[in-house]
Regions:
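C-terminal polymerase-core module
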Residues: 483-490, 494-546, 713-761, 765-767, ...
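Non-catalytic nucleic-acid-binding/docking modules located in mid-to-C-terminal regions
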Residues: 49-53, 98, 121, 140-144, ...
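Active-site-proximal helix-loop-helix substrate-binding element of RNase H-like nuclease domains
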Residues: 152-176, 183, 328-459, 483, ...
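Noncatalytic, basic helical substrate-engagement surface that gates or grips nucleic-acid strands
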Residues: 1-129, 133-155, 159, 233-236, ...
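Function-dense linear segments that define catalytic or interfacial modules
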Residues: 371, 385, 389-417, 427, ...
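Conserved "right-hand" nucleotidyltransferase catalytic core of DNA-directed polymerases
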Residues: 230-349, 361, 424, 429-604, ...
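Conserved RNase H-like, two-metal-ion catalytic cores of nucleic-acid enzymes
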Residues: 3-4, 8, 14-51, 69-70, ...
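Conserved catalytic core of nucleic-acid polymerases
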Residues: 464, 576-577, 581-584, 659-792, ...
Length: 848
């Protein structure tokens, strides 16, 4: 028999703090529940236990509290955001049939120990899942600790404990008696840390052994004095740190077998929590009202009989029998259309003929693949009249997914009819109608009709057109990078004196700090930190550090961009990136295959990557880029006179900022002052405080704080705007862009300072960054339409951050540049005008 025991409090805390804030539409927190259930499901899948027990701490004091008043006295209370999830999680586990166990006066650790001891007596296998290293003392021939870390779950048996710590599992009690435990406020011996404690136990076996050999020369005088002064604390700590294996709980076989529970209640609760993705993984069926009737599916050939009017079109979710989300149907069609309570199975070929049919209006749940079909067939998708997924995105940009079934559950929609072949068919029309009404109620109709929906067609056309790349140039660049990589490696190995795995932070740390003796800056759990910030601070100590930084740059460019680009070049020599419209919470676009937003530009080598995006023979690339759009929007939104005046007079905003702050003429502003002003201009917008700014500028926190205060005194309109934005967001629960795009910020109501501060940063940044995203999207729609209206061959092919790139025949390039500049600058009429610079070149680097 195999028993799995979960340390409930330890794992739920790890889930809560390890997963970003998740809430339901009505503001209930769910991240701890979602994370804990994922941990449980992964453990069940990996280990297939016969029985499962979930151990919980109780609020009542334990025997350890009675023994030592200071026990766990320094711990903060449970965050309210977690506390409100605990009873819900326990109810969910009960509904699922899992047995929870707790015992007044005893801790969950003692329950783990008691169950492990019972299994050992029967020679049964026991698995203890926890994030607490205290449980490692329980590892035995029958008990394995499944230690949850930030990245993985590590199985720790006695041999693994010996290899990591150099002592037996039970000797970890002796180690803790010496080093103490700050998290539990166990005192130990003041001045003795883990390294010294391990050395003492490795040499003398136990705490008693240490004191029996207190005069041993291996115990230095200073250490001896500490041990003698704190012997009582050490003995107390040993008692406090020992897990007791005799808690009065059920231990008989069968006590923790899974019970029938209430699967329907569990499914209902998960639906209410908007965690529907767990329902199929738990083998549950979503609770739905009985349908009024079951409708048949008409074959595609029936479509000509009704080939006019309005159809609601969606794709059947890809599923398998194992996943159990939907039944798998014996039909090649994955598309369906609903009209007048009739459901039609659509082959892609038949669907394609409808995409530009003037007699029909297609209400698409997701228009992106439909537009892709249309452009591939030489059309434009003129029959598509709306997009339900975009409506769902506008209403909740933080949603985990935008599936019809998930959204219907969230809105409490139950279909009026059933269709076994297409289970979502009965939900589609009422769902889209409900979301359309919500878009209207929340004032986002103009945002949908003038920006988001028309943009879907533009993006599909851009993907279809693609951008030509210089494949040979990319390959040659890759060869050069590999040569440079080899040179870096040779110099690094020569400086260190031996070869090692440069991609291993542990081995690199040993080479730099142990072998070369460089001063370590900070340590991680696995050893010395070798992150970029650390290495950059060490460049003056040894030339090898610069070689390591260069090695990382070359490796990143080669693996991510050279090899990454070569993999996605199509037969036509072009890259057809997928533009994602419903990913970023601020409304910004992203892209995949490749991620064009991450094409590097900050280094000379990285910027050379742009040279490989080229125009075909007889054409040129036209690149138009907004100048400081977010700062211009900040000046407009805040109404700050000094900032507005600088832009209206065409002055360098960063130079002008420095001049205003230090009361000097623009011409006396030094490069250093301008750089500081630039950092503050952008830092204010992104909610940076004095600490972050001090790191950006390489100054003290005190100096950075003075800079910030001076800035806010100089631009009081900005300060007032930021304060009012946060206050408004706290009152409403969301922030809006100037176009009305909303982003809910439940973080603002958190009692956790870090979570709340993060929410305030998002409140400052989202209205400006989101408005910039809205503007670039609107500009794309206007440019795309203008090029077609003038009958030009020029095509919009790329967007990266605040840039738009058009591929134009040489004869049209100048006109394309004029159109880009005009449409981008005039798509809004704000108190601070937008500024765009357009350039022409044979490749992206030349045009930028």
């Amino acid at each position: 028999m195999k028993l799995l025991v979960l340390d409930g409090n330890s794992l739920v805390n790890r889930a809560f703090f390890g997963i970003k804030v998740l809430t339901t539409k009505d503001g209930r927190f769910t991240n701890a529940i979602y994370g804990f259930m994922n941990i449980l499901l992964n453990l069940l899948k990996a280990h297939e236990p016969d029985e499962v027990a979930i151990a919980w701490d109780l609020k009542a004091p334990t025997f350890r509290h009675k023994m030592y008043d200071g026990y766990k006295a320094t711990r903060h209370g449970m965050p309210p955001e977690l506390a409100q999830q605990m009873p819900v999680l326990k109810q969910l586990l009960a509904d699922l049939g899992f047995v929870s166990v707790s015992c007044e006066g005893w801790e969950a650790d003692d329950i783990l120990g008691t169950l492990a001891a019972a299994c050992a007596a029967r020679k049964d296998d026991c698995l203890l899942a926890t994030g607490d290293r205290d449980s490692l003392q329980l590892a035995s021939e029958t008990t394995t600790i499944l230690l949850a870390t930030n990245k993985e779950t590590i199985p720790m048996d006695p041999q693994a404990v010996r290899e990591k710590y150099g002592v037996e599992p039970r000797q970890l009690i002796e180690v803790k008696s010496l080093m103490g435990d700050s998290s539990d406020n166990i005192p130990g011996v003041a001045g003795i840390g883990e390294k010294t404690a391990l050395m003492l136990v490795q040499n003398f076996g136990t705490l008693d052994g240490v004191y029996a050999h207190i005069d041993d020369p291996r115990i230095k005088p200073g250490m001896r004095a500490k041990l003698n002064a704190h012997k009582a604390e050490a003995e107390l700590s040993r008692t406090l740190g020992t897990i007791v294996c005799e808690a009065p709980i059920e231990t008989a076989p069968g006590s923790y077998a899974r019970q029938p529970g209430d699967p329907a209640a569990a499914a209902k609760l998960l639906s209410e929590l908007e965690i529907q993705t767990l329902i199929p993984r738990l083998g549950l069926t979503e609770a739905k009202a009985a349908p009024r009737r079951e409708l048949p599916v008409h074959a595609a050939e029936a479509m000509p009989l009704l080939a006019e009017g309005d159809y609601y079109v969606a794709m059947r979710p890809a599923t398998t029998k194992k996943e159990g989300v939907h039944n798998v149907i014996d039909t090649p069609s994955c598309w369906y259309a609903v009209q007048n309570e009739q459901v039609f199975a659509l082959e892609e070929a038949r669907l394609t003929t409808l995409l530009d049919d003037a007699a029909v209006r297609l209400h698409a749940f997701d228009s992106a693949p439909l537009y892709a079909m249309a452009f591939a067939a030489g059309g434009e998708g003129k029959s598509i009249c709306e997009d339900g997924k975009l409506a769902a995105y506008l209403l909740n940009p933080s949603a985990r997914d935008y599936l019809v079934s998930t959204l219907a559950d969230a809105y409490g929609i139950e279909g009026e009819f059933a269709c076994p072949e297409f289970p979502d068919a009965g939900l589609l029309i009422p769902l889209m109608q409900r979301m359309n009404a919500q878009v209207d109620q929340q004032g986002m109709r103009k945002l949908m009709d003038e920006i988001e929906f028309p943009l879907a067609q533009v993006l599909a056309d851009m993907t279809h057109t693609g951008v030509l790349v210089d494949e040979e140039g990319i390959r040659s660049f890759g060869e050069m990078l590999r040569t440079e990589l080899e040179g870096c490696l040779d110099r690094i190995y020569e400086a260190v004196g031996y070869e090692f795995n440069l991609n291993s932070p542990k081995q690199l740390g040993e080479a730099l700090f142990d072998k070369l003796g460089l001063p370590p800056r900070k340590k991680t759990r696995s050893g010395y930190s070798t992150d970029a910030e650390t290495l950059e601070s060490l460049q003056n100590y040894s030339p090898v550090v610069s070689d390591i930084l260069q090695y990382r740059l070359y490796q990143k460019l080669n693996s991510t961009y050279v090899e990454g680009l070569l993999k996605v070049i199509g037969p036509d020599g072009r890259i057809h990136s997928n533009f994602l419209q419903t990913e970023a919470r601020t409304g910004r676009l992203s892209s995949t295959e490749p991620n064009l937003q991450n094409i590097p530009i900050r280094t000379e080598l990285g910027s050379r990557m742009r040279a490989f995006f080229v125009a075909p023979e007889g054409c040129e690339l036209v690149d138009a880029d907004y100048s400081q759009i977010e700062l211009r929007l900040l000046a407009h939104a805040s109404g700050d006179e000094a900032m507005r005046e600088a832009f209206l007079q065409g002055r360098d905003i960063h130079r002008s900022t420095a001049a205003k702050m230090y009361h000097i003429p623009d011409e006396e502003v030094t490069p250093a002052l301008r750089s500081s002003a630039k950092a503050i201009n952008f830092g204010i917008m992104y909610g940076k405080g004095a600490f972050s700014l001090s790191r950006d500028l390489g100054i003290s926190v005190k100096e950075a704080d003075a800079f910030l205060k001076n800035y806010l005194d100089t631009f009081p309109g900005v300060d007032g705007y930021m304060r009012s934005t946060i206050a408004d967001a706290k009152e409403k629960g969301y922030v809006s862009t100037l176009f009305g795009r909303r982003r809910a910020l439940p973080e603002l109501s958190s009692t956790n300072f870090q979570v709340r501060s993060g929410g305030e940063r998002m409140a400052r940044n989202t209205p400006i960054q989101g408005t910039a995203a809205d503007i670039i999207k609107l500009a794309m729609v206007r440019v795309w339409r203008r090029l077609r209206a003038e009958g030009m061959q020029s095509r919009l092919i790329l967007t990266v951050h605040d840039e738009l790139i058009v591929e134009a025949p040489e004869a049209e390039a100048a006109r394309a540049a004029e159109i880009l500049q005009h449409e981008m600058e005039h798509c809004v009429n704000y108190s601070v005008p937008l500024s765009v610079e357009a350039k022409i070149g044979r490749n992206w680097l030349q045009a930028h």
